[in-house]
């Protein structure tokens, strides 16, 4: 029976490309349902969304139309009316919710006809992604469950466990530290990734205090979850409150990412499309068993044309109607690459900045067609622009997921340096481009990072565990790709187990386990960790070389550096105007590391991180136990100048008053342009600024100097004028002076060592 759905004949006959669902206008509502195997279809209209209420208003017979669709119209303003479909297949009639319902009543049984624009928040028409135009590698993604943010009393958020909890500002702990939205904004992340917020199963929305669930149990894909709304009974409320939440995020400079679960449904037999077209939505074997690569009881047959259309339509709807800025796909590897590419293409037609990423684990599934390619990690080249979570960096840093007490790099395990280097460079073994690699050390699955460290280093003091946590964060936050962190990681989130230990699968554990414990921020050690995360994020944002988008750029700019210690890795990263030197030491002892020649500014060390310079060092540095040390320096801009002699005097110039270091004296010259030799640059500059031709002779000396606004390498040449008389075309004044007269003029700081050398070598005049 099910094989026919994947046949070419069935797809050619019944693939429909138009709009489906209920389309409201003040004058009438038009309905269209895809039900190619149905013998009869009707619409039931209800006064309320309560499935137990006896409030039927009317029943309308639908008429068969093109490509297996059924249509009907109802004149009059139906805004706020609820509806279902009665579908008869093979003599059995079922009442089902519209797969394209935009909202529902309580528990998602009855769809609701809604004037969607009527619930838009103010300025919704001008609402936009605050990070539009940026690369996904510029993102820092923060994974958050709607309920976790606000359910703890210490959050002091009024709308606990609700969409509106994410709109509240000014909330603080008793100690005065920001909570909720203010905390997220201050952290510096760019994208808030919300765990599933469409209508999901398991949770009874009618309860005053609904059961907790992560939400990976899809029921109505295009409907917001009612348990997160202040009123789950009236379908307009959940729609309005999601829009208010997204608007609040955008107004605070945060993009919104939606976690979507198209790879399986909560109950395959009860799912609306499988009720309307029995078995069509799912992969079912010839013996009638559901494929179960998802380990959730069923797998979605995305390779079928109308399943693919449904998924594409659904994602586009959330991007269009709710202004979602990104989508994270749960077990994307069960969805075929054609569908993934069609989703991205369709969304990007209107919203070119929307980001896409997901899980690419290789899961077994029973495909309904031959030759289908799935969106697994190793097929990243087939889905350009789609990112995948890197389980490699996760397991190397914290220990393999399949052995709960096995330590990782940060807890002192000896791991492959080559593997760590590959992680830092964005996993070239499977990520076609670095922007397809999502780096993380914790997410909602498994234990939190701090809990995992406690399991793998049970005898380590708390201070050492915090160091391990921070080392992991520094490594993944500075790696090429897209950094991703679980909400609360920045304040050492923990999930205590019911009978001791830790909860490693809290998908339906109570708020007491899952909520963010804001009160911990009133303790200094937690504030220190939070400050460290803020500094890491700020540092990443400040350095474009940590956010490269192409494999060629990574190969050109990122260079592993040999470290003898087996617990230490280091990297040198080239920037357009500077360099970064990063050392990650997981040893319990300090490690000495030789720096490349020159002076380096320390930006990250021990428990401190940021963009400010802590100190300037050179030569060899000592990297503290279990810590990262990151140093930077700006590349010197090549500057050339002339020691232009006329008998026993040389020429000096006074800088214009309106320029940096205005009215200070200097030697004539300027910046070297691309393709020029130093003598050529000096000759050009002196012609432009002095109107003279130079005979450039031997080099006198070279110095480096760091100004607040520029780092220069200045090379000085002996010269004489071969043609012309110097004119102050760009300078304030010119002077010919004896070497012994330099103390009568205030020179630019970069010239200090040059003046000393002139005085030492010549002391008096120097005729040429």
Per-range role (PLM):
Residues 1-26, 30, 52, 56, ...:
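The feature marks proteins involved in alpha-glucan
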Residues 25-39, 538, 558-596:
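Carbohydrate-binding surface patches
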Residues 35, 79-81, 614-634:
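C-terminal beta-strand-rich structural cap/linker in extracellular carbohydrate-active enzymes
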Residues 114, 344-500, 507-509, 558, ...:
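Conserved alpha/beta catalytic core and glycan-binding cleft of carbohydrate-active enzymes
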Residues 147-322, 332, 340-351, 355, ...:
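Substrate-binding/active-site clefts of carbohydrate-active enzymes
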Residues 481, 485-498, 515, 519-580:
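Glycan-recognition and catalytic regions of carbohydrate-active enzymes
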Residues 635-638, 693-695, 702-725, 733-741, ...:
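Active-site-adjacent beta-strand/loop module that shapes the phosphate/pyrophosphate-binding cleft
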Residues 635-650, 671:
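Conserved N-terminal beta-strand and adjoining loop/helix that marks the start
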């Amino acid at each position: 029976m099910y094989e026919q759905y994947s046949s070419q004949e069935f797809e050619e006959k019944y693939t429909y490309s138009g709009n489906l669902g209920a389309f409201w206008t003040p004058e009438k509502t038009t309905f269209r349902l895809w039900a190619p195997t149905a013998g009869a279809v009707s619409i039931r209209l209800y006064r309320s969304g309560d499935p137990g209420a006896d409030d039927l208003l009317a029943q309308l017979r639908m008429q068969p139309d093109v490509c297996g669709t059924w249509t009907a119209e109802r004149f009059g303003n139906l805004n706020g009316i609820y509806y279902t479909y009665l579908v008869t297949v093979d003599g059995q009639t079922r009442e089902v919710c519209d797969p394209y319902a935009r909202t529902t009543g309580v528990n998602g049984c009855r769809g609701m006809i809604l004037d969607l624009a009527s619930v838009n928040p103010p300025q919704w028409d001008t609402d936009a992604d605050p990070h539009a135009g940026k690369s996904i590698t510029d993102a820092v993604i923060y994974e958050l469950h709607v309920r976790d943010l606000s359910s703890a009393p210490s959050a002091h958020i009024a709308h606990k466990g609700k969409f509106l909890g994410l709109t509240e500002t000014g909330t603080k702990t008793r100690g005065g530290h920001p909570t909720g939205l203010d905390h997220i904004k201050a952290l510096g992340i760019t994208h808030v990734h919300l765990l599933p917020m469409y209508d999901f199963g398991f949770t009874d929305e009618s309860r005053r205090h609904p059961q907790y669930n992560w939400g990976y149990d899809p029921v109505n894909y295009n409907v917001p979850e009612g348990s997160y709304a202040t009123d789950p009974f009236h379908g307009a409320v959940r729609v309005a409150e999601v829009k208010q939440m997204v608007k609040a995020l955008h107004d605070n400079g945060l993009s919104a990412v939606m976690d979507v679960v198209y790879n399986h449904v909560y109950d395959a037999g009860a799912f609306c499309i499988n009720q309307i077209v029995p078995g069509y939505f799912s992969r079912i074997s010839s013996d009638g068993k559901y494929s179960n690569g998802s380990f959730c009881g069923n797998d979605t047959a995305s390779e079928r044309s109308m399943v693919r259309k449904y998924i594409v339509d659904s994602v586009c709807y959330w991007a269009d109607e709710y202004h979602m800025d990104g989508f994270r796909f749960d077990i994307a590897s069960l969805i075929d690459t054609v569908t993934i590419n069609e989703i991205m293409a369709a969304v990007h037609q209107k919203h070119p900045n929307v980001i896409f990423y997901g899980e690419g684990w290789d899961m077994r599934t029973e495909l309904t067609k031959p030759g289908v390619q799935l969106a697994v990690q190793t097929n990243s080249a087939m889905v350009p622009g789609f990112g995948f979570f890197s389980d490699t960096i996760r397991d190397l840093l914290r220990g393999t997921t399949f052995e709960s007490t096995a330590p990782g790099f940060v807890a002192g395990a000896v791991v492959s340096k080559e593997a760590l280097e590959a992680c830092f460079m964005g996993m070239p073994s499977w990520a076609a481009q670095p922007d397809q690699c999502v780096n993380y050390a914790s997410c909602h699955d498994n234990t939190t990072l701090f809990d995992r460290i406690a399991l793998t280093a049970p005898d380590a003091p708390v201070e050492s565990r915090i160091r391990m946590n921070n080392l992991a964060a520094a490594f993944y936050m500075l790696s090429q790709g897209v950094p991703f962190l679980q909400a609360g990681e920045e304040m050492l989130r923990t999930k205590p187990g019911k009978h001791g230990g830790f909860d490693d699968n809290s998908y339906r554990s109570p708020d007491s386990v899952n909520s963010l414990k804001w009160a911990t921020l009133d303790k200094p050690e937690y504030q220190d960790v939070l400050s460290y995360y803020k500094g890491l994020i700020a540092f990443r944002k400040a350095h474009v070389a940590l956010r490269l988008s192409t494999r060629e750029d990574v190969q050109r700019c990122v260079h592993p550096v040999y470290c003898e210690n087996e617990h230490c890795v280091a990297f040198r990263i080239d920037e357009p105007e500077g360099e970064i030197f990063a050392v990650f030491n997981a040893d319990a002892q300090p490690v000495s590391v030789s720096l490349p020649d020159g002076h380096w500014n320390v930006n990250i060390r021990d428990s401190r991180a940021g963009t400010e310079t802590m100190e300037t060092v050179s030569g060899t540095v000592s990297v503290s136990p279990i810590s990262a040390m990151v140093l930077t320096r700006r590349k010197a801009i090549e500057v050339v100048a002339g020691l232009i002699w006329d008998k026993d005097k040389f020429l000096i110039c006074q800088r214009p008053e309106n320029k940096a270091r205005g009215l200070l004296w200097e030697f004539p010259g300027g910046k070297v342009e691309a393709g020029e030799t130093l003598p050529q640059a000096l000759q050009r500059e002196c012609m432009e600024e002095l109107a003279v031709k130079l005979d450039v002779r031997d080099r006198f000396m070279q110095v480096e100097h760091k100004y607040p606004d520029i780092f220069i390498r200045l090379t000085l040449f002996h010269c004489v004028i071969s043609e012309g008389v110097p004119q102050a075309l760009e300078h304030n004044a010119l002077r010919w002076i004896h070497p012994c007269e330099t103390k009568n003029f205030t020179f630019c700081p970069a010239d200090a060592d040059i003046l000393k050398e002139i005085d030492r070598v010549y002391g008096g005049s120097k005729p040429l």
